[in-house]
C-alpha cells in the first residue's frame, strides 16, 4: 500500500471510529506519512488513528503526530472559547451575526478538532460592523490587524484570529 492510500485508510478509520489493523510502521513510513498528511492538513486525524491503533512509539515522527494532535485539540478549544465569548457579548449588545465555514462545519465531524481551521469567520451586517468591532476591542481586548475590501481581521489575547466579513463576494472579483 502506498503512502497516499495508507493515509486515506487511516483517515477513514478515524472518521468511522474503527481500529486500523495492528501493524509495524518504519520510521521512514511515519516520516512520509507525516509529511504527506501535513500537506493535506490531515496530520491531526492520521495521528489520532495511529494513536488509537497503538502504532506510535518514541521516535521523532511519532512525537510529531502526537504533538499535532495535541495542538489541534488545544487550538479547537481556544477557538470554541473565543467564539462562545464573542457570542455572549454580541447577544448582550444586540449584534446579529452568522458563523461561516469551519466554525459551522466542525459540528459535522466526529471530533470538532478534526476540522483544521486557522481562523473564525463571522458574517456581520455592514451597519453593525463598527459596533461589532468596538465590542470586540473594548469587551474582549481584541486587536484589529487588517481591513480588506470584504473583511476586517482581529486577534484575541490568546492569538485566535477572527475575520468579520461584511461582504460575501469581493467587489474586485
Give the label of every model feature segment.
Residues 1-118, 124-173:
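Conserved NTP-donor binding/palm subdomain of two-metal-ion nucleotidyltransferases/polymerases, i.e.
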Amino acid at each position: 500500500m502506498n503512502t497516499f492510500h495508507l493515509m486515506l485508510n487511516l483517515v477513514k478509520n478515524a472518521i468511522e471510529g474503527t481500529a486500523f489493523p495492528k501493524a509495524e510502521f518504519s520510521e521512514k513510513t511515519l516520516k512520509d506519512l507525516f509529511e504527506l498528511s501535513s500537506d493535506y492538513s490531515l496530520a491531526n486525524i492520521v495521528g489520532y488513528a495511529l494513536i488509537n491503533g497503538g502504532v506510535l512509539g518514541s521516535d521523532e515522527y511519532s512525537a510529531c503526530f502526537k504533538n499535532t494532535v495535541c495542538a489541534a485539540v488545544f487550538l479547537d478549544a481556544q477557538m470554541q472559547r473565543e467564539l462562545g465569548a464573542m457570542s455572549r457579548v454580541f447577544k448582550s449588545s444586540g449584534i446579529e451575526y452568522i458563523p461561516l465555514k469551519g466554525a459551522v462545519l466542525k459540528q459535522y465531524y466526529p471530533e470538532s478538532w478534526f476540522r483544521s481551521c486557522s481562523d473564525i469567520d463571522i458574517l456581520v451586517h455592514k451597519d453593525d460592523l463598527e459596533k461589532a468591532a468596538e465590542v470586540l476591542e473594548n469587551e474582549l481586548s481584541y486587536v484589529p490587524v487588517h481591513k480588506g475590501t470584504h473583511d476586517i481581521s482581529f486577534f484575541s489575547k490568546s492569538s485566535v484570529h477572527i475575520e468579520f466579513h461584511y461582504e460575501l463576494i469581493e467587489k474586485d472579483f
